[in-house]
Amino acid sequence: MNLTTAKEGKEYVIQRIETDDQELDAFLFSLGCYSGEPITVVSRKKKTCVVSIKDSRYSIDNQLAEAIMIYE
C-alpha cells in the first residue's frame, strides 16, 4: 500500500520508495523518508497530504505520496 491509502493519524513504516527519479529519491532521503522509518499522515487535502517524519511535518503532493510504499 502507499501513502494515498493510509489512514490519518495512524503510524506506518516506510517499506520502499518506488521512483526512478534520482533527484526525487535524494529529496525524500534528505527529509528522512527512507525504508524502515516511521511515517504518519497528519491530514489530507485533494492534491496534497501532510506527513510527519522524525518529529517534522511536510506537505507532499499525491504523486509523491503514491511513490512511498508503507506497511503497518
Task: State the predicted function of each range.
Residues 1-2, 72:
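Absolute protein N-terminus
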Residues 17-19, 30:
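A structural micro-motif recognizing beta-strand termini
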